[in-house]
Structure formats: structure tokens, C-alpha cells
Amino acid sequence: MTVVDVSFEVRCERLPRDYGYALYEALAGALDWLEDEASAGVHPLHGTAAADGELFLGRRARLMLRLTEERAERSLALAGARLALGSGLEVGAGKVRALMPYATVHSHFVNTGCADEAEFLARAAAELREAGLPERMISGKAHAMSTPEGELRGFSLLLHGLSPAQSLAVQARGLGQGRKIGCGIFVPHKSVVAVGAD
């Protein structure tokens, strides 16, 4: 099963800063199979935070979904949709992109079900070990997100020293809970060169 990213152009003046669950709900309403797709992930949106607690998306902002190839092709039908989120999120054209085997990958927010950093790292290490992946990691900033079930807490996490196969595996499977609301999705760390690129 090959996992890929789908990148959509988006237009939206403003979003609530804590938008993760609302974005998932809007996407699930537009893609009737998303809720039942266990391996699906929704990347965090990148924008500029304002003092009033909103998030502004620039012209380069992209809505990114991590999906199996089969679902990726079906997700392209999302183009042209207007999602009821913030001031209204208009979805433009989508492109399917292969995952890149970088030796270092980073997730903005990994949720392992605990707020204590030492316990967080222990749980992350156990999950990596169970998946046969190396436990070379560095935790970063603490994060929190509101959901109907309560507040989720976690940390950013960097994994390093990965082989090409390990890099693709952890990007495909993710780590922790909440992939559909933006947690545990790893992307290449931009300060390093893709493994095997040269």
C-alpha cells in the first residue's frame, strides 16, 4: 500500500487558531469515506497567528491530505468545494505528491495521550520500537488542541538518522493519536538533504 500526499490550493481570509477538529469535520462532510479511512491524515495548515486568536492563511498556504494512492485520486474531487470553516475555506486544484525519504522528519504536534514530556517520550519510543523503527528523537514545543472529547496535549517531535525505508514507513504510518486532526504527521525536516538525492 503506497501512501502519498495530496496538496490543494486554498483561499481563506481567516481561521480559528484551534481549527484542527473543525477542519476534519468539514472535510469528512465533503469526503464521505474519510471518517472510516483509518490511515488518513490531515496536515496542519500553516499561517500567521493574529493577536485576536485567529489564523491568517497566505497565498502559499496549502491543504494537505496524507492518503493511500487510491483514496488520493478520489480526494481530487474536493477541488471547488467551499468548506464551512472560519471565513469559508475555498479548495482549489489538487496535486498528488510522493513522500520523500529524508533522514530527518518532523511532526508539529504528536499526541500520545499524556502531557508529561518524559512520559510522552517513553510512549513515543515504545510505539516506534513496536513498529521496528529507531528511537532517535528530540522533543520540542508543547502544544494543546481542543476537541469535543476534551483537550489534547503533546509536543513537536523530530526523528533523525532514518534510512530511506524507515523514513517512508514513519511518514506513512504516523505516530500517536489524532492523524485526522493534524497530529502525528511527519514531514521532511527542511535543513537536511533527502536521503539518496545525490
Where are these regions (language model features)?
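RNA-interacting cores
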Residues: M1-D198
